[in-house]
Every structure is written in C-alpha cells, then in structure tokens.
Amino acid sequence: MEDNRIQNQIAIYMTNKKLCEFTDKLKPAPVEYYAHMHAQGEEQSAGFRAYSCIGVVLQDYSNGKGDKTVRVTANLSPGFFPFVLSRMQNDLDRFDFTEEKIFGDPDENGLSTVTKLSIKRASVGNDGKRRNYPWCIIVENGRAVKEKTPTGGTHIKSGTYKKQRSVYVNINDLDFFNIVYRTARFIESWELTFGPKLIRDARKLLDDQRAAAQQ
C-alpha cells in the first residue's frame, strides 16, 4: 500500500516557506574493499560504480506549492556530519564549506548535471548585528560541459555552466544542530548494521583464499 511506502528521510527542517531535508543514500563498499565500509566509487559486482552519501534536498514554496515549488538536490559525504558536529561543539563562530560536482552522462547538448553546495555560519551579519539564524545552506543545480583533468578526474569546463535552480535556507543553531546530530547518529547506526557483516564476509573470503593457496 502507498501509505506503507518506506521513506529515506533522516532529518528535516521546515518553515512555512522553506524546507531542508537530509536523506539516506548510504551504500556499502564491495567486499573486496570491506575496510572502506562506505562505497567510494569502487566497481561493484554488477559492473557499475556506487558512492555512499547523504542526500540534501532544499525546497522553496514561497511562491506556492506543486508546480510553483523550487526543488534542488545535492549530496554530502558521510564524513561531513561528524566533522561539522565536532566543530559545533567547540564554540563555533564561523564555518564555511563549499563544494561543486559534475557527473552523469552528457545530454544531447553535451551538458552534464552540476550541483553546487554551500554551508556557512556567520554569527554577525554585514550590519554588525547578531544573527538569529546564523546558518545558511545554499544548493544550486545546473548543467555544464564535463572536462577531464590531467590527473584523471573531471571538472566543469570554464564558461559552460548554466544555472537552472537555486534555493537557500537560513537555520538557527539549535535546529541545525538537531538535523546534523540526527544524521550523524543515523550514519553511526548504519555502520554498526552493515559493517560487521561486511567484515565477516571479507574475512571468510580471505581465509578461503589462503586455504586454497596452501593446497
């Protein structure tokens, strides 16, 4: 039944105009790379490459819901959440994190998907006054030409980026801590759930390989 559909939402912050949501997109590493625990782009048994991440969804429905809602998405690595949590526990005054990614197959115009993500904290605004909502999350989605780097990676080819949608959400300290803390705890629970089996499977394969080599 539709009412029983499993949701991958981990944590959510919502106002009457904006929404910020963290979602479960975690994936285990293949057994050959068991110690990675999280998939980091290693080739899977089916031949594709997977990445373990936390999804970020921002929505702006200040102009209305349905077709009028602006929705953007991005991904964060699992390691981001314990990192920012540790910074927040040390009387954090300023925080500045930006990341942009280009991925996916090019469309008929040679453009691939681009996500730009910014998470910043500033306790004082440009006017010198203390901010009640010091955290600002900005996600921008667009398209660009994917270009290979000399080291084998990819980046956005200069001058080709075309912005499609952008949403920002301002959050106070308590609400931001809550959604980050809940996500960090979920990641820990996920690792304690999938990690032991991954380690056991890898150890068994390793023991079998050693036994076969001694015959």
Where are the regions that the model predicts?
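Conserved beta-strand elements of beta-rich interaction domains across eukaryotes
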Residues: 61-63, 81, 144
